[in-house]
Amino acid sequence: MRIYLSLCLFIGAVAVFLACQRQAKTATDDALYQSMSSKRVKLPNGWSLTPAGEKSLNLNDLPLNLVLSPSGKYAAVTNNGQSIQSITLIDPTTQTILDDVKTPKSYYGLAFSADESTLYASGGNDNKILVYKIADNKLKADGDIVLGKPWPVKISPVGLCLDDAQNKLFVGTKENNSLYVCDTKTRKVIDSVALGFKAYNCQLSNDKSQLFVSLWEGSAVRILDAKTLKTVADIATSKNPNDMLQTRDGKYVYVACGNDNSVMMIDLQKRQVVETLSASLYPDAPVGSTPNALALTPDETKLFIANADNNCLAVFDVKQKGRSRSLGFIPTGWYPTAVKVWNNQILVTNGKGFSSSANPKGPNPNRSKSPQYKGANPQANRDETQYIGGLFKGTMSFVPMPDERTLATYSRLVYDNTPYTKAKETLAEGEAGNPIPMRIGDNSPIKYVFYIIKENRTYDQVLGDVKEGNGDASLCLFPEKITPNQHALAREFVLLDNFYVDAEVSADGHNWSAAAYANDYVEKNWVTSYGGRGGTYDYEGQKTIAHPRDGFIWDHAKRANVSYRTYGWFADGKANIPAVEGHYCQDFHGYDLGYMDVEREKAWEKDFDELVKNNAVPRLNTLRFGNDHTSGARVGLPTPDAAVADNDLAVGRFVEHLSKSPIWKESVVFILEDDAQNGPDHVDAHRSIAFVAGGYVKRGFVDHTMYSTSGMLRTMELILGIKPMSQYDAAATPMWRCFQKTPDNKPFTAREPGINLNEKNVAYNYNHRRTLQFDLSQPDAIDDRIFSEIVWQTVRGEKSKMPAPVRGAFVKLKEESEEEDDD
């Protein structure tokens, strides 16, 4: 196998970067560069957007796939996000939407008939194929092809391909890992075969004799005989192969590998990978580009690769097979998921649109017992709810095919938008003498890291009442009376009012919090179950397809010979991943909203004291205190106030106990939420609470620096000597401003909350009945928008209106000068 990681990545991508630097000399004269730069949008994760294109169309949630009809008369998009799912019919020539039909469930698969009179679409966990007739430029439902009974029966169709001459529709699935053959005339399943792995894309060879199936879970492309369905060959690829593209001559298939920054070219005669293209912006970059869609120009000389997590298209010259070279990059919207070329235009679907935003109407776990307080934020007093999972509507961009100069300008913009560089990977931002080193392996006076993960709160929900920070008191559900310890940590150590989680919900949140990355499987699947459309919660190590390529923080610690131990996180009574086996506390209760966090804290104290006694405290300690998730209004379970207060007291007692231990002077505690989905925030739906405590942490300090989940992880990595896990933590700003050179080892004193921790929900009301429908045994195995509303009303009153979420499409960039204030 010929690997072009060094040639195509190092020579190609670096050559592009150097060309962009040369162009910088004339940038002031470049009207396109100046115009696009002036519209730059900075996302909550620190990355930026300057999407190319003269026109765009608004779509629904998370467009996953885009297909063109045989003549190019139509384009179809399937929108498969958390809220509204639909099929959109588009005229790619006039660049207008012809029709948009809502679907109960849909997922990825689309196929036009040869005569363009019929469109087939995968019906998600309804386990059927939706059939539409196209007449007068409209989609008209024309029945279904049923594969089996709906969820909880596990089938879930994904990629489709059609052999019109044989009246056969081939369907890959991702829940029962199979390939189905359907008769399009009788609308019946006529054959099926087990694949053994979750499928993604399904394509027929040009002569219709063979099928190519990308085994999303199996790190391979399977070739099957189209008549017998017998396996002809399995061709090994990198992790998470997704989209595929066949050349017209039938000699090669390109496959994007979403969990590996790469696209592989398969020689179908040799049945092996003969070239690997690295799609990332720098040589040997860690995981984080997420290539997930492919397109060729009509003459097949240029290949476009949609890099979902780099927010760009990578462009390769592929005229000479085995001698491909990088030409540059094109900036897109947020999380591009599909790309096609038509009529000298590049069509791109942007899964999360063009920006993030605030959600003052966000979910509220604690709807008040008294009339809603009307504060300064007028949006907080309107009726609609803004749930983060459905806030980011997709878009489609139409980008005229760029010439060489325009592509150079686009490439420079992509590099400008991307905070990750190879230099940052090895030399982080910081200051000389600070306890946070700037290089991996440099010494730090801090020896022990304690990392606490909690559940789902925004900044305004908890600290909106703190006058020193940028808060909105009208959105504060859990003020100091309920969360005295978190308020004390913010006041005594560092108040962080510009901290953003990288995730939308717990499914991707636990991946971002444990690996600074959520791969394409996670990002494209959590929306289904969170939208109440079936699916399972398996995003905390349960399925290897959801694992980042290089594993989680414990895997990286193991490679770096850093000792570690986890308490209830990725270890619910047993190890969820191999790296945690033998490194978890069996007496620490896993996720269970019926078990108090203060009891978990006692179990940690007992285990910790024994480790201290034996001089065996690991350097990295991860803990889960998750009761601030709350149980909503379910009768017999703690009220939202009591659950959050329990969580707060556990945190306070933890810091107090550690601060009175012999290792406090060498310790630091980092605390964050896995996501911020369960509440409103007037700045952005991703803004959340975060805390840092320890001897080397500043006292009485307000830090307005923009930080992220990945930045907190980067800070821990620099202390412990662990290399970045992804491009995101490599790029993120470390939290060095929170630290001081001279330690202050004054211990912390926990505060008792101003409410009864044993207070239970007692009202058999409408919200109780709604809560009974929820599965609270796992994080967010529920409709979180509704759950957030229940929490809001339980706290603020059953008739109060929960503010909508603000999602940060975020801030239009000014060159930022970070502020830090001493109190």
Please annotate each region the language model reported:
Residues 408-823:
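N-terminal pro-sequences and low-complexity stem/linker regions of secreted or lumenal proteins
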Residues 17-19, 817:
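Long, compositionally biased, charged low-complexity segments
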Residues 8, 20-434:
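Predominantly soluble domains enriched in secretory-pathway, periplasmic, or organellar proteins
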Residues 15-16, 111, 618, 708:
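A general, composition-driven signal for non-globular sequence regions
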Residues 1-5:
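Positively charged n-region of N-terminal signal peptides that target proteins for export
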Residues 8-15:
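Bacterial N-terminal signal peptides
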